[in-house]
């Protein structure tokens, strides 16, 4: 928080978050503080897998089991379960065991919606495990996208393959590779880069171990990785293609500063303001965007998804809250 602030600091706040507060207005720091406190009561959320079911079927099955839920107006496949419902309850459902639903936070559902991959497009998920966003891209494109999913960790690649199979996602090219070293032979219409980060947006008040995880050493490591991943992504992105960069961080070093620096290095790339999509047409070919993407832009505008001021105009910083983890999204287009 700013010097001279009288706001009580968040108890046992990791140093990285405290440093971020120092660069913010008191109002924004207080909103984030409140979000971290409310996160302790964050409800379980899940996504209906459109490759295997419909939102209405999921609603019907949840009702039959007496599980309270709320639908999300900006994404028909998203469900917020009632107070007291735990993940264990979902694990026991046939819906879950059959791959008809996937446990996924609301914030992590945002990147595939913002990317808005076209049906039949060549899509790269650069850091794909455990597969939630990969499978969501497949569902949003009706299984027509040609998806390449990168994961350099063998155990995580196995988990990715298992989840995609369970969710009915077929034909994905899983590459056991470091996405920072992808050959320039490859090229993609759309790229999702949900980059490794400090995870500061996921902090919850009372997490005493976060101080040991969220360190300056980790930030230095993730920032180097993010830079390399962004450079490689913008290299293998086709002209006219789009890259969605995201993190679950509230730190400018991982968000706006990374994106601004990448745009300086890649002069043929520019930001596509996410709220512009509310008009319902893509800026390159005037074809209507999916209704879910238009609804997402509207939710950013009307406050249904709480946001903070972003340093790079047109990008979105989701404020931590009871329902949302702190998250950052930037949509970049290559000329």
PLM region spans:
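S-adenosylmethionine
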Residues: 1-335
